[in-house]
Regions:
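Short, small/polar residue-rich loop motifs at catalytic or cofactor-binding pockets
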Residues: 111-114
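Glyoxalase I/VOC metalloenzyme domain signal
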Residues: 1-3, 9-29, 40-87, 96-102, ...
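Short proline/glycine- and acidic-rich turn/helix-capping motifs at secondary-structure junctions
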Residues: 89-91
Length: 245
């Protein structure tokens, strides 16, 4: 599943523009009085100004061979988020079975052969950088924003995870990721190694914290797919446009 465009809201437009463009180095494609559009690998990332405080989970994919270099590069520019919780945490109910230790700044996902690190952006959204062993695109010399492949995850908090997951599966033909995992009551990844919709129960803590909890905020996604369609996920402010690829 390819995420071509992500449109999110923010109450802190100037700060977000500065963070993603100047701090992280994403190319700035367009800027207006009430929005900014950036390029995150192959994904367009747009922030639209709003009067409300909102919170999102967003992930950038990295080639696995650049993970440590990218982590060091980001850490020089913004504090990484440390894991909170018990001294040793194993999440057997998670779709991805994450291993991590409190106080560390990296999570390993053995089931999908991936690892990630996290930071907060200028509006305190949870920003994840993830590298899969099976994504080994050529990245010689790439550093910083140039190493970002695409937006790989967008969070969609809901009251009933299984109900929305079923709607997405039927409408978009996407499956749980990895395919061997059933849909959990509080958390589901839908998609593939290239992109996932993270359907999570309202109030669920976003890793790596135990205190930043999932809330509803407007999301518009453009995906590449076999057939063009529009999907509105009422009663939530989530809309998906699929363009035929």
């Amino acid at each position: 599943m390819q995420i071509a465009e992500v449109i999110l809201h923010t109450r802190h437009l100037a700060d977000q523009t500065a963070f993603y463009h100047r701090t992280l180095g994403l190319p700035l494609l367009a800027e207006t009085a009430d929005s900014c559009t950036l390029q995150a690998g192959t994904t367009r990332l747009r922030f639209q100004e709003t009067a409300s405080e909102v919170l999102y989970h967003l992930a950038f994919a990295l080639p696995c061979q650049t993970f440590q270099a990218a982590k060091a590069w980001v850490r020089e520019r913004v504090p990484l988020l440390a894991l909170t919780g018990s001294p040793q945490v194993y999440a057997p109910t998670s779709p991805l079975r994450a291993w991590h230790k409190a106080g560390e700044d990296e999570i390993v996902f053995p089931l999908i052969q991936a690892r990630s690190f996290y930071c907060g952006d200028a509006a305190h959204n949870i920003l994840k950088f993830i590298a899969y062993e099976d994504l080994r695109q050529e990245a010689a010399g790439a550093e910083g924003a140039a190493a970002v492949l695409h937006v790989s995850e967008v969070g969609l908090p809901v009251a009933d995870v299984r109900a929305l997951a079923a709607r997405l599966q039927e409408a978009l033909g996407i499956e749980p990721y990895p395919v061997s995992r059933p849909i959990a009551e509080d958390f589901a990844y839908l998609g593939d190694i290239f992109g996932q919709l993270v359907v999570v129960k309202l109030g669920h803590p976003w890793l790596p914290t135990q205190t930043v909890r999932a809330t509803v905020a407007p999301v518009h996604l453009t995906l590449s797919g076999p057939q063009a369609q529009q999907l509105a996920l009422a009663p939530y402010p989530y809309t998906i446009t699929v363009t035929a690829s």
